[in-house]
Amino acid sequence: MTPLIFVTGGVVSSLGKGIAAASLASILEARGLKVTMVKLDPYINVDPGTMSPFQHGEVYVTDDGAETDLDLGHYERFVRTRLSRKNSVTTGRIYQNVICKERRGDYLGATVQVIPHITDEIRRCIDEATASFDVALVEIGGTVGDIESLPFLEAIRQVRIERGAERTMFMHLTLVPYIAAAGELKTKPTQHSVKELRSIGIQPDVLLCRSEQVIPDSERRKIALFTNVSERAVIGCPDIDVLYGMPLELRRQGLDEIVIDQFKLSGTTSLADLSEWEDVVDAIKHPLDEVTIAVVGKYVDYRDAYKSVGEALKHGGLRQRTKVNLKWVEAQDLEGSDMAALKDIDGILVPGGFGDRGFEGKVLASRYAREQRVPYFGICYGMQAAVVDYARHVAGLEGANSTENDRQSSHPVIALITEWRTTTGEVERRDEKSDLGGTMRLGLQEQRLKAGTLARELYGRDVVGERHRHRYEFNNRYRTQLEDAGLVIAAKSMDDTLVEMIELPREMHPWFLACQAHPEFLSTPRDGHPLFIGFVKASRARKAGGKLLREVCV
């Protein structure tokens, strides 16, 4: 059986369970172990696909088309393992599975209850997602004490009884607040959080203590005494300047050794080689250049809605030792044609979104970038905005729009996809009356790049795969007309039915590229992504007056 590390949180939410868990996973991976991660989310939605970005933040998409929590993005940025829908489990999905089994008669007339039926289904999902790995980390969303989390906590308590301490570990993340008026750290919230956890039947093996500053040894001893946790296993997690430095911090305190010792894996692992993370941290702390990128979006008041976009831009910068400053611009604010927010910036990125609110602002951002020769990178809705702009103002198609926003448009250059193939090769069909949840073109899709294009140059390959999440697409009726007007179709789906990327000729614009996919989902701090690296490089060139002062890379 795969050894399991269960990660819970206490005191308050948003302490960084996902980052802490992913950082530990990266250390274990660096020791030669095959690692995976699972997120258990207590909400009753089947998945976050239809949840508001203002409430939930980004919807992260996996290769197999699962719409998941943004924590899976953290996981994939820290470890090499590519995750799937098995790695994202919600209360809604658990109940959906159990009810389907009950309707089929699988329970043979039994009264279906939380224990054992719901907890058994949770355990089954954990087993399915973690089989064949050396170690798995399972994060339980929410905070200990939340009523929604109780079935998950009961399930992992049962797993501990079944597998024992040599195959399970409980890791609890708590808050140790600093009270400025008293000038001291307070351990009482941590003590109460562990007390709450123990009342459920779970005794933590490791405590990760979040704090604004380093926790003194005297406070660590106090926490260990009152929580029945070894002092060695009370790990401090102080605020750090660089997020990607967390693996180095946890390794310094020996967290991986605690895991190796408890699971008795010392004979199967090597010392952790964290040189890649050291290089990442060094590149972030010591940039040789910097640029300012405007992100023109609909949900900029809640930055988690664009979490992967922001991280991918930073990755693109650190791959060339460039600090990327992000300027968040509300798309609606541009609709009065006041482009002041886009002055003195080095590049414009327009990310994905849904609905007509702010769309005209995105179109105006595309037009501004095109006319002012500012590097432009459009993603998903950002590509659609660029197509609408080009159709209206270059191709002369007055009234051009997306049918998502105007079903009566005289020139629907963007329209609903009614038929496409899924990642498994099955044909999907949709219309305007279809359900919203899980009905988009989702997951990793291959596309063929056109020779001689900027896209082909950046990728260095003829065929690439990118993750998608959209239900509207370039209308093929306008392909020829827009190409005749100068628009370059840089990539198409493998069956030649869908336009995947567009760009402007380089004699018309130094760097104008847009894609229907979401390349941010495949960007990592250690590797970056070709499109983001190229975009940041173009922004550097604009800032330098068209010629880079220095070529740098890590």
From Swiss-Prot:
Binding site for UTP: S13, K186, T187, K188, P189, T190, Q191, K222
Domain of life the protein comes from: Bacteria
Alphabetical UniProt keywords: ATP-binding, Glutamine amidotransferase, Ligase, Magnesium, Metal-binding, Nucleotide-binding, Pyrimidine biosynthesis
Sequence segments annotated as region (Amidoligase domain): 1-265
Activity control summary: Allosterically activated by GTP, when glutamine is the substrate; GTP has no effect on the reaction when ammonia is the substrate. The allosteric effector GTP functions by stabilizing the protein conformation that binds the tetrahedral intermediate(s) formed during glutamine hydrolysis. Inhibited by the product CTP, via allosteric rather than competitive inhibition.
Catalytic activity: UTP + L-glutamine + ATP + H2O = CTP + L-glutamate + ADP + phosphate + 2 H(+); L-glutamine + H2O = L-glutamate + NH4(+); UTP + NH4(+) + ATP = CTP + ADP + phosphate + 2 H(+)
E.C. no: 6.3.4.2
Residues covered by the Glutamine amidotransferase type-1 domain: 292-545
Positions that bind ATP: S14, L15, G16, K17, G18, I19, D71
Residues given in the record as CTP binding sites: S13, D146, I147, E148, K186, T187, K188, P189, T190, Q191, K222
Positions of the catalytic residues: C380, H518, E520
Residues annotated for L-glutamine binding in this entry: G353, Y381, G382, M383, Q384, E404, R471
PROSITE patterns for the chain: GATASE_TYPE_1 (PS51273)
InterPro entries attached to this UniProt entry: Class_I_gatase-like, CTP_synthase, CTP_synthase_N, GATASE, GATase1_CTP_Synthase, P-loop_NTPase
GO BP: 'de novo' CTP biosynthetic process; pyrimidine nucleobase biosynthetic process
Matching SUPFAM superfamilies: Class I glutamine amidotransferase-like, P-loop containing nucleoside triphosphate hydrolases
Pathway: Pyrimidine metabolism; CTP biosynthesis via de novo pathway; CTP from UDP: step 2/2
Binding-site positions, Mg(2+): D71, E139
Cellular component annotations (GO), alphabetically ordered: cytosol
GO molecular function: ATP binding; CTP synthase activity; glutaminase activity; identical protein binding; metal ion binding
Similarity comment text for this entry: Belongs to the CTP synthase family.
Further remark: CTPSs have evolved a hybrid strategy for distinguishing between UTP and CTP. The overlapping regions of the product feedback inhibitory and substrate sites recognize a common feature in both compounds, the triphosphate moiety. To differentiate isosteric substrate and product pyrimidine rings, an additional pocket far from the expected kinase/ligase catalytic site, specifically recognizes the cytosine and ribose portions of the product inhibitor.
Subunit and interaction comment: Homotetramer.
Its job: Catalyzes the ATP-dependent amination of UTP to CTP with either L-glutamine or ammonia as the source of nitrogen. Regulates intracellular CTP levels through interactions with the four ribonucleotide triphosphates.
Protein name: CTP synthase
Organism of derivation: Xylella fastidiosa (strain M12)
Gene that encodes it: pyrG
